[in-house]
Curated annotation (Swiss-Prot):
InterPro entries the record matches: DNA_helicase_Holl-junc_RuvA_I, Hlx-hairpin-Hlx_DNA-bd_motif, NA-bd_OB-fold, RuvA, RuvA_2-like, RuvA_C, RuvA_C_sf
Region (Domain I): 1-64
Gene: ruvA
UniProt free text on domains: Has three domains with a flexible linker between the domains II and III and assumes an 'L' shape. Domain III is highly mobile and contacts RuvB.
Gene3D superfamilies from the UniProt entry: 5' to 3' exonuclease, C-terminal subdomain, DNA helicase RuvA subunit, C-terminal domain, Nucleic acid-binding proteins
Protein name: Holliday junction branch migration complex subunit RuvA
HAMAP family: DNA_HJ_migration_RuvA
Amino acid sequence: MIGRLRGIVLEKQPPLVLLEAGGVGYEVHMPMTCFYELPETGKEAVVFTHFVVREDAQLLFGFNNKQERTLFRELIKVNGVGPKLALAILSGMSAQQFVNAVEREEPAALVKLPGIGKKTAERLVVEMKDRFKGLHGDLFTPAADLVLTSPASPAVDDAEAEAVAALVSLGYKPQEASRMVSKVAQADASSETLIREALRAAL
């Protein structure tokens, strides 16, 4: 089991990051709320990981802290919620925002996320609220504001294409993803900025 990685950020292709640790390059899937906080390419990063083994693939999911990883692990225990949907949930809102929505019993806040229908949202609220009773401490500490640390801005067309591709990988339909990015498009914006603003506008 790989639980933590410390290494150099080689590539950033939202929501994937390629992290070199001990001479090995690890492809790590990260929620966008965690991806925003990665250092620039060439710098060292530390991520807490969850390893998923499937018949057709072995996937590594990464998080900035243990609390985010704990929430991810609790999410994938819910019936009908797999790693991909859990990743989409934590990309659309921070861990603390999700906890708040569940604690306040607001399934409507979850329906706005890709792949979440009314029944799934209601099930998440019921099941996760029960699970939260056994979780205390930092998971309920207000999350810090997200900080974008990406240095250079790629060409606008490339940035928009990357943003659309990232949203599609999170569960949005191509047409919807393109529309979301177009609404927040701005000159010299990086793909990470476009993704963050598109997800924020969708809530």
